[in-house]
């Protein structure tokens, strides 16, 4: 992904993390609470098999749609 798109995507990931603070369900592996920023980044990496910086530019809009899905469906 080009630098400009990667930067925009990182900002969107951070905003999604802000939105998800306190919304993720409890998990026994995270007794002090879950990190919503890491959750979004890990979900993106898992779905697209690459770090957000390494996803092709052609998938930029698809990544944004997926992040919106994560916000609507905290898990």
Regions found by a protein language model. Give the residues of each.
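Positively charged, phosphate-engaging catalytic surfaces used for nucleic-acid and nucleotide handling
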Residues: 1-75
